[in-house]
Curated annotation (Swiss-Prot):
Function: Endoribonuclease that cleaves single-stranded RNAs at 5' of uridylates and releases a product with a 2',3'-cyclic phosphate at the 3'-end. The UU and GU sites are more efficiently cleaved than CU and AU sites. Targets mRNAs to regulate their expression.
EndoU domain residues: 137-410
Source taxon at top rank: Eukaryota
Domain (SMB): residue spans on this chain: 20-62, 86-130
EC numbers on record: 3.1.-.-, 4.6.1.-
Protein name: Uridylate-specific endoribonuclease
Effect of residue 290 to Q: Abolishes endoribonuclease activity without affecting RNA-binding activity
Disulphide bond pairs: 24-28, 24-40, 28-58, 38-40, 38-51, 44-50, 51-58, 90-94, 90-106, 94-124, 104-106, 104-117, 110-116, 117-124
Cofactor(s) of this protein: Mn(2+)
Catalyzed reactions per annotation: ribonucleotidyl-uridine-RNA = a 5'-end dephospho-uridine-RNA + a 3'-end 2',3'-cyclophospho-ribonucleotide-RNA
Entry annotation: catalytic residues: 285, 300, 343
Family as reported in the entry's similarity comment: Belongs to the ENDOU family.
Keyword DNA-binding attributed: no
Amino acid sequence: MRACISLVLAVLCGLAWAGKIESCASRCNEKFNRDAACQCDRRCLWHGNCCEDYEHLCTEDHKESEPLPQLEEETEEALASNLYSAPTSCQGRCYEAFDKHHQCHCNARCQEFGNCCKDFESLCSDHEVSHSSDAITKEEIQSISEKIYRADTNKAQKEDIVLNSQNCISPSETRNQVDRCPKPLFTYVNEKLFSKPTYAAFINLLNNYQRATGHGEHFSAQELAEQDAFLREIMKTAVMKELYSFLHHQNRYGSEQEFVDDLKNMWFGLYSRGNEEGDSSGFEHVFSGEVKKGKVTGFHNWIRFYLEEKEGLVDYYSHIYDGPWDSYPDVLAMQFNWDGYYKEVGSAFIGSSPEFEFALYSLCFIARPGKVCQLSLGGYPLAVRTYTWDKSTYGNGKKYIATAYIVSST
């Protein structure tokens, strides 16, 4: 496929030029500087090109980075993560990303800046290698993402999917809620794909959720077994074996069972987006989709989209981005109506296997929680944004996935 425009996020560029400016000292909130090796402007966090000292030098000096209007859940999740009392302990926070709303900090450089919580040394001294989000380099993430890309043998082939992407609009038009595409997005999908074990296990999960937040999720024994079956099937694939091998080598997990248990908690563990206890999870939000305050949130999966469109529940309106890949998986950023509720921009892989998406989102959440994660797929750069759910935790203070989605590409 060919790109019609860039996603509103700019192309992520690795500006590592020798001899260029590499610090934000006296540069906070300046305009983009093409002569600098890294940036200190308000949008560098979204572009993934901030200097290493940006968060420590600049985040106290300006207001929140301006939200990206086409991805409404970004601001929603960012606000949700701050709707709790700022903690004064490092319990469950060792080597988390810097958050200016916290009274004290537990990140890798808090000792350097003298703003650590009092229990930082006692709680975090043994966690630096295994829990620091900076322990896995950008180059390592890009390398493993290429391996995962090559390992996805369950993906759709060119002849398995016929798309009719139709009208490409500008980002300024995404809020208009105008249906510019008279025909469905999917002209044809070879449904034999859905008989593959991971696809079948994935599809079994999609009807286990109530899409409206504020209504508690209550799983039957069969539905809980379906979660285990999905994890069991994807762990048989080369995609997930590549991911586990990488994370095991990075000392993130000591055994495959520990890895699977953590995946189950971070993705399927319930938390509360609305008034009802346990009304949401990372899996429901990202893959199945939710409705909150009259808007579609999450819903970043092509299989779910196809099945709902086939039933007449999804009406495809337009797209603002069509990725550069000439085979599957590809990427599409689209506007649609889901049974009466509008999605301003929903980015999604097209034609990927369930394990492929699950692996990449998990990789980014583990390696870059709450940040932009820069990948490489078939030689093309791609970025994924994750958010942590900070209002509740599991295990020894671990955080659930709030959301994960594609934010940029070339």
